């Protein structure tokens, strides 16, 4: 019995190691925004590019009602504005939708998370944007994605796109759905390798999505898989790493005692 308890403790230690790390709910598998900072506000009077900090709590354009009412958890399913070509979830059971398309009116929403003293070898995250086309580069619906090294104030990953008429605000990763006049991307996987010059630094991921400035066209983005391991694609509904390690540990115990 004591040996069994000892082995169970070992399995628990393995699980605890799986839980260790800087990211909090990076894959949204808690079914909510725990670990993240949520923001939102009205951008009808502001031109592109937008300042995400202005829409976060304490920012000049922050509105709690917009922050809490325009973004949220989504479950697997096809996005109608892409011609049902995009699954709303990249990996697992949930992702986060930044902004929406149900309430168009010149709104912007933001989600952000900071990780400190980061030492894992990589940072990954997945995103997919959906933008309704109209207007020019400075007033079209837009998305802005940044990963910043806070320790050195260095912008490491930056993605900024908008739905200006004619496709001038997007690049080849975007597709166009004529039926909804929408520019959209399949899921994009971002990776930052953490070498010796970055190990131990603090990093911030900030994602903004916004309707157009004239307030008549939507823009939103799905976010998933912020963590140290590349998220597996949709279709393979993975266990969170912690539960996978627990299952591995307990499975090994069962095999060990079955052989005795």
Q: PLM features: residue spans?
A:
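Active-site-proximal flexible loops/turns
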Residues: 9, 135, 213, 246, ...
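Sec-dependent signal peptide recognition
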Residues: 2-10, 242-245
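A short, hydrophobic C-terminal helix/tail in secreted or cell-surface proteins
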Residues: 238-256
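Aromatic (Trp/Tyr/Phe) and Gly/Pro-enriched flexible surface segments
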Residues: 21-234
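Positively charged n-region of N-terminal signal peptides that target proteins for export
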Residues: 1-4, 239, 256-260
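Alpha-helical transmembrane segments and their juxtamembrane interfaces
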Residues: 12-13, 249
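Sec/Tat signal peptide C-region and signal peptidase I cleavage site
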Residues: 14-20
């Amino acid at each position: 019995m004591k040996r069994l308890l000892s082995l169970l403790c070992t399995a628990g230690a393995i699980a605890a190691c799986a839980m260790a790390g800087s990211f909090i709910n990076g894959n949204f598998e808690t079914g909510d925004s725990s670990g993240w900072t949520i923001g939102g506000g009205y951008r009808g009077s502001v031109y592109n590019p937008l300042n995400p900090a202005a829409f976060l709590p304490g920012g000049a354009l922050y509105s709690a009602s917009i922050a809490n009412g325009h973004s949220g958890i989504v479950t697997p399913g096809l996005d109608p504005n892409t011609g049902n070509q995009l699954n709303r979830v990249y990996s697992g059971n949930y992702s986060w939708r930044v902004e929406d398309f149900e309430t168009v009116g010149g709104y912007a929403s933001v989600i952000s998370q900071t990780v400190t003293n980061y030492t894992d070898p990589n940072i990954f995250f997945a995103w997919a944007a959906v933008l309704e086309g109209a207007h020019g580069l400075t007033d079209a619906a837009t998305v802005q994605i940044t990963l910043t090294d806070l320790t050195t104030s260095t912008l490491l990953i930056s993605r900024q796109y908008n739905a200006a008429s004619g496709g001038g605000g997007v690049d080849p990763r975007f597709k166009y759905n004529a039926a909804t006049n929408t520019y959209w991307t399949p899921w994009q996987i971002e990776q930052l390798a953490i070498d010796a010059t970055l190990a131990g630094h603090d990093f911030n991921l900030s994602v903004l999505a916004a309707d157009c400035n004239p307030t008549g066209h939507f823009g939103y983005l799905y976010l998933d898989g912020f963590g140290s391991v590349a998220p597996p694609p949709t279709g393979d509904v993975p266990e969170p790493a912690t539960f996978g390690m627990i299952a591995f540990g307990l499975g090994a115990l069962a095999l060990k005692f079955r052989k005795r």
